[in-house]
């Protein structure tokens, strides 16, 4: 096989792979937090700390963009058998695809990043030096978000949560 024939083969394979990659992105939603969480949403999930039992929870959320452009998300979280806990997020875009946020239960600034249909968040929790790492994936239907969280102490995972969020707007 000549060098030019080999080059043509490689170019055709590369073109096919690029076409397949582009096609796989068609129909996939982009995670824009202020759009995804605008309005009302409901979440159901489970959290487990250390080796303890799994604790079911529900979350009712209401999100809106404020006059200054920041996005506010008010949440009521209920763990089974416990009173409702209210918390509030205030999020803003710092650069394209990058976010900062404050959260009632965080001891410092939360940072986030979007990549296609995924949002990743990281923030320190109040007390004990705990850090929450969350990965939220917007499904292809555009109405469901799957949230996986890992709670870490000194980098060691000590708890996790899984939640399915239904967007009802």
Give short role names for the model-derived ranges.
Residues 136-144, 148-169:
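Edge beta-strand at a domain terminus
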Residues 34, 54-56, 129, 142, ...:
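Short coil/turn motifs at beta-sheet boundaries
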Residues 37-45, 147:
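A short, Trp-centered hydrophobic/proline-enriched beta-strand micro-motif
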């Amino acid at each position: 096989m000549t060098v030019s024939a080999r080059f043509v083969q490689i170019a055709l394979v590369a073109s096919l792979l690029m076409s397949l990659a582009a096609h796989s992105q068609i129909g996939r939603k982009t995670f824009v937090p202020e759009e995804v969480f605008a309005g009302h949403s409901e979440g159901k999930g489970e959290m487990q700390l250390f080796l303890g039992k799994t604790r079911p929870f529900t979350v009712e959320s209401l999100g809106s963009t404020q006059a200054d452009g920041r996005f506010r998300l008010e949440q009521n979280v209920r763990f089974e058998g416990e009173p409702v806990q209210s918390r509030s997020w205030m999020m803003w875009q710092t650069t394209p695809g990058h976010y900062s946020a404050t959260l009632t239960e965080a001891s410092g600034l939360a940072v986030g990043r979007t990549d296609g249909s995924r949002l990743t968040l990281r923030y320190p929790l109040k007390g004990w030096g705990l850090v929450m790492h969350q990965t939220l994936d917007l499904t292809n239907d555009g109405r469901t978000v799957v949230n996986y969280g890992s709670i870490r102490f000194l980098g060691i995972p000590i708890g996790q949560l899984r939640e399915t969020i239904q967007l009802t707007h």
